[in-house]
Amino acid sequence: MIIEKINNNVCNMDDFSNTKKHLDKILISSELLLKRVQKLYSESGFEIGVSLGSGETLKNGDILYEDENRIVYIEVLPEEVIVITPTSIKEMGIIAHNLGNRHLPAQFDEGCMILANDYLVEDLLKKEGVPYQKENRVLPKPFKHASHKHI
């Protein structure tokens, strides 16, 4: 079976947690969300091919297949990340400048910056005296290195 379009997500289902259907997860890393063409297997061994159009990506909770007995959906695995919660605008600026010079991809949440787990980043944060935490989080989108050029 090949899926070419995602029509629903478990977040849009009012009765998802109470459904009588078998919930069959496909556990993937956040990096696989970006792959438009791939073969995936659910926890029960159900095989699904994915062939999405240009610009389309998978999202956590996407339903790939549903019938009267089963819902097969994507669940993104948590990954260890570095979470920085700046205590001032100055601290935020210093952190952003230092990390930006290294062209590191970052994500932002309420009051915090999220970075891929990297010992070099940890060394920099320790050197600068910036408090951080390591957490396991499900990322809504993968870290993606953006291309750039200096003018």
From Swiss-Prot:
The record's subcellular locations are: Cytoplasm
**Predominant location of this chain?**
cytoplasm
Q: List the disulfide bonds.
A: none
Which Gene3D superfamilies does the record match to this protein?
Urease metallochaperone UreE, N-terminal domain, UreE, C-terminal domain
Record key words, sorted: Chaperone, Cytoplasm, Nickel, Nickel insertion
Task: Write out the function statement from the record.
Answer: Involved in urease metallocenter assembly. Binds nickel. Probably functions as a nickel donor during metallocenter assembly.
**Per the record's keyword annotation, is Cytoplasm included, yes or no?**
yes
What domain of life is recorded for the organism? Answer: Bacteria
Q: Which family does it belong to?
A: Belongs to the UreE family.
The entry's protein name is Urease accessory protein UreE
Query: GO biological process: any one?
Result: protein folding
Task: Give the Gene Ontology MF terms in alphabetical order.
Answer: nickel cation binding; unfolded protein binding
State the species of origin.
Bacillus cereus (strain ATCC 10987 / NRS 248)
Keyword Ribosomal protein present in the record's keywords: the answer is no
Which cellular component terms (GO) are annotated to the entry?
cytoplasm
